[in-house]
UniProtKB/Swiss-Prot annotation:
Keyword annotations from UniProtKB, A to Z: Cell inner membrane, Cell membrane, Membrane, Toxin-antitoxin system, Transmembrane, Transmembrane helix
Name of protein: Protein HokA
Alphabetized NCBIfam families for the sequence: PRK09759.1 (NF007290)
Subcellular location, principal: membrane
Entry GO terms, CC: plasma membrane
UniProt family annotation: Belongs to the Hok/Gef family.
Induction and repression of expression: May be repressed by MqsA.
InterPro entries, sorted: Hok/gef_toxin, Hok/gef_toxin_CS
Amino acid sequence: MPQKYRLLSLIVICFTLLFFTWMIRDSLCELHIKQESYELAAFLACKLKE
């Protein structure tokens, strides 16, 4: 049973990150999240606005 909750938590976190990235896609080029021994880094190809 705890394994189901772990998988569900991971899915919720992934969807939350995707939604967050979609919301601020024009201003987000790099995202770093550090927590204890884990690190999440996401990089997007960004064009500088002229």
